[in-house]
């Protein structure tokens, strides 16, 4: 049996190294692709507000006979500057609450925006006595520059601002004669949305 030339051996060894390297690179590519991809289940998983307390908000209205009707609702409460700044950014569902109530320490005229907010919302503003001032609908803003997002502002100073899924204000009993107040109790099954 004739001996192969050293050049021929080197060529075969080189080919084996190239094949091994190509296999390793391909395997690494598959591992990286699989390791960094997310399933649609992960991407589509509902994200509700995190790091906020839920509390009962009482909605009272004067009926046509002059009596007061009240209903308790469950809301996420944003009462620190960090919580108010985060609000409903990145949230895809309100979860087991009817909305988020932003509580200011004193009357303010600060505007709201929808930067990085993913769901359409309605907002209602209330004064320091909880009396209804104004309401409007807001649309998500996914602009990379927050300066490109519209601002939503009421002409009056407010202390409370309630954000709910767009169109839910009437369903929750919020209208021009509504008065809201926070009740010192956490949400129960009767006040929490199922």
Predicted features by range, described:
Residues 31-33:
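C-terminal motif of bacterial Sec signal peptides marking the signal peptidase cleavage site
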Residues 4-23:
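Bacterial N-terminal signal peptides that target proteins for export
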